[in-house]
Curated annotation (Swiss-Prot):
Binding partners and assembly: Homodimer. Part of a complex that contains DSG3, PKP1, YAP1 and YWHAG; the complex is required for localization of DSG3 and YAP1 to the cell membrane in keratinocytes. Interacts with PKP2. Interacts with CTNND1; the interaction facilitates DSG3 localization and retention at cell-cell junctions. Interacts with CDH1; the interaction is required for CDH1 localization to developing adherens junctions. Interacts with RAC1; the interaction is required for DSG3 translocation to cell-cell junctions, organization of cortical F-actin bundles and actin anchoring at cell-cell junctions.
Membrane topology term: Single-pass type I membrane protein
Tissue: Expressed throughout the basal and spinous layer of the epidermis with weak expression in the granular layer (at protein level). Expressed in skin and mucosa (at protein level). Expressed in the basal layer of the outer root sheath of the telogen hair club, specifically at the cell membrane between the apex of the cells and the surrounding hair club (at protein level). Expression is less abundant between the lateral margins of the outer root sheath basal cells (at protein level). Also expressed in the tongue, tonsil and esophagus.
Repeat positions for Desmoglein repeat: 910-935, 936-966
Domain Cadherin: 50-158, 159-268, 269-383, 386-499
Natural source organism: Homo sapiens
Region (Required for interaction with CTNND1 and localization at cell-cell junctions) residue spans: 642-714
UniProt signal peptide: 1-23
Protein name: Desmoglein-3
Amino acid sequence: MMGLFPRTTGALAIFVVVILVHGELRIETKGQYDEEEMTMQQAKRRQKREWVKFAKPCREGEDNSKRNPIAKITSDYQATQKITYRISGVGIDQPPFGIFVVDKNTGDINITAIVDREETPSFLITCRALNAQGLDVEKPLILTVKILDINDNPPVFSQQIFMGEIEENSASNSLVMILNATDADEPNHLNSKIAFKIVSQEPAGTPMFLLSRNTGEVRTLTNSLDREQASSYRLVVSGADKDGEGLSTQCECNIKVKDVNDNFPMFRDSQYSARIEENILSSELLRFQVTDLDEEYTDNWLAVYFFTSGNEGNWFEIQTDPRTNEGILKVVKALDYEQLQSVKLSIAVKNKAEFHQSVISRYRVQSTPVTIQVINVREGIAFRPASKTFTVQKGISSKKLVDYILGTYQAIDEDTNKAASNVKYVMGRNDGGYLMIDSKTAEIKFVKNMNRDSTFIVNKTITAEVLAIDEYTGKTSTGTVYVRVPDFNDNCPTAVLEKDAVCSSSPSVVVSARTLNNRYTGPYTFALEDQPVKLPAVWSITTLNATSALLRAQEQIPPGVYHISLVLTDSQNNRCEMPRSLTLEVCQCDNRGICGTSYPTTSPGTRYGRPHSGRLGPAAIGLLLLGLLLLLLAPLLLLTCDCGAGSTGGVTGGFIPVPDGSEGTIHQWGIEGAHPEDKEITNICVPPVTANGADFMESSEVCTNTYARGTAVEGTSGMEMTTKLGAATESGGAAGFATGTVSGAASGFGAATGVGICSSGQSGTMRTRHSTGGTNKDYADGAISMNFLDSYFSQKAFACAEEDDGQEANDCLLIYDNEGADATGSPVGSVGCCSFIADDLDDSFLDSLGPKFKKLAEISLGVDGEGKEVQPPSKDSGYGIESCGHPIEVQQTGFVKCQTLSGSQGASALSTSGSVQPAVSIPDPLQHGNYLVTETYSASGSLVQPSTAGFDPLLTQNVIVTERVICPISSVPGNLAGPTQLRGSHTMLCTEDPCSRLI
């Protein structure tokens, strides 16, 4: 039983539900639109006692009455009782009234008017089913009548003119604006779907913007927007519904291109210049114009001027005129012509706004030159600096300030920056009348003493003014003077020594303090002035009582006068401005304690307790400096001396001949009268000469004078002068003699002290020179230095060579040229023996020259036919001569005799009465005796110059050189040789091959 009851209850519940489901209010709709009716038929499903919400839609703008009833409501209770149907809502009992009506018996709902969807998109009708008592048998339901839309409304833009802006140079596809348009037709319907498009663009040309068809977004088409080309654009835009196929409308879009700083300002002129007087300020000296294509009166256009160089003194400023954008150059600091005659500025310009990112990388500062010429004006005078401070020296009493000179304070002429002239100085403000200034020199000094408690002394300083008046223009300049004064102590105590002199054995003395009044009272403190660190302490002081102290030396000090600086301080710690200087004499005392030596106390000395010492005076210092200057000038004076005998101007330049007083010095050569010709002289070293295995001579100092294939050999201690042609060879011996050779095969050789060996060949001319020893009557006791003779003859030879060709030769060898067998006027085909003397010169005067020159005249005339006998030196002589590294020693003693032979054939021989001795070294460096010098001239047609003679410094003082011409000879073939049979004999024969040279 218990399980049957729940099952019965469940069955009853299911039955009630079924009944309720099958009992409903049905609404039927009818219409001519099948698809819509099919939609509404879905509402016929059974619901639990609910009204159907939808009715057949009605199209707006049409007469829908032909579709009545548009809906029908039915209640299930209609079958059992009378039901009355009623409707209410907008369009029924609310405005607009009477659009819908219902048949109260059948429930048919009819439309009676044309509806507008834009006014009422849908109608909500409340449906009720009433019984006879007027009570609702059904729950009221809402019936919705939808109004179908037609495309009766065009799109409407929210603005008739849309305004937008975009920066120039913006990137493409940048959003400019969004257009807004609406359509009154049903939303989300094709009738309200609007499509946008650009109808036109002003200015026309390349399309610059893109309009989105669906969203209405206006974007840039390119990145080439340029405000300088087009500052704004006007677009005509169309909006059409039904996605561009329906109704359309238009609007206007104005797009402004915003300016950016993409243009650099540029100066209109490449340079600027102006003039201004010095010492003048100017609010507008110059204007600079610039060109900027950016939008005017914006920060992109507004220029900012600045200096790049030249304004280091901050004389100028540049201000921008906001109306014209010009730069105004101002002078804010006066210019001085004396310091700056012209100013060269460099200016540049930029904009107030930063440059746009699209061009900032291309910006470069470009400077424009500006020249400012400063005009000089007469400036007058001024005090520089405008004030000056003077300080009164410490220790000066306020009662002793009269005529105390502080210094000078002169005005400056600003045109010259020097002390002004023609200026009169006067005092301006001079409180208390303490100061006075000299009207000419500007010297400031005190004219009266002052009281330190004076009201005119503020902070220990007196202030006054000085006026400088220009006497020409009357202009006045003012300067301020500050005088700092110390604390005057007019009653400081005075230190007095008990005695002025003390003994050096016990240098001590008592010092006492005294005052002029009782203002400063004891006890007094005594102290020595601080000494420099470099000076050790010499004195010390010890207080004895309230007014005195003991001054003593700390170490043994020498006698003298000492100056000691002492500082006194009273009980109130007041002291004098300057230390007191004490003078103390330290002296040597005798056993009685009395000074034995007195030192002047008035002489100046060194402070800090040191004795004064002597010092050099100005005269002594001047003499020292003069001596140093003379030492410095000595090398310079040596440069002006004539050192050496170099010729500078011909024969006479630098050459001094031997005085005429020297007897037998030299024979004149230039008697022939012909003109000399210079020849180059080559010095070579002569190797050893060997004849049949025997060495005749070696010498390290034997040199040859070679010209025209000839060779001359000079010995170490002899002299040889030769002139020849062909293969002529001469050799100078080792001991103060020389030989001369002839042309052709003639040879000469000398090898002994005081010996001359001469030879001549066939048909030639040989000239011999004999050297005869002698003495000078003025210099009989001395010997001429051979260094001097060597230098003398060398200089004379060079002087002759440098002589002008047009000048007649007076002292040089003259060579006969163009001589031969065909020569006219000569019996032998050449110059006759002494013919030039016999024809042109009366030589009878030679007979009266005295015995010394008698022999010389005979030799010159060719009268002498025998060799002269000369006495050789008493000592054996020998020389070691080195030639090219080979030593040789030659010695000859005895009487020497030289003879010259001539003939058509054969040879010449010279004989001596001596014999050849072994080589012996001679300790005596001097050579004594007579020496033979022979010289040979060639008879060929070439010109030959004499060689430079080399003299041995060991020869005797007086040397007589003679010359003789024998006769012309012809060349004899053969080489220079010494036959074996002649070795060791007293007579030697020398031959020479004219076509070969000495080897």
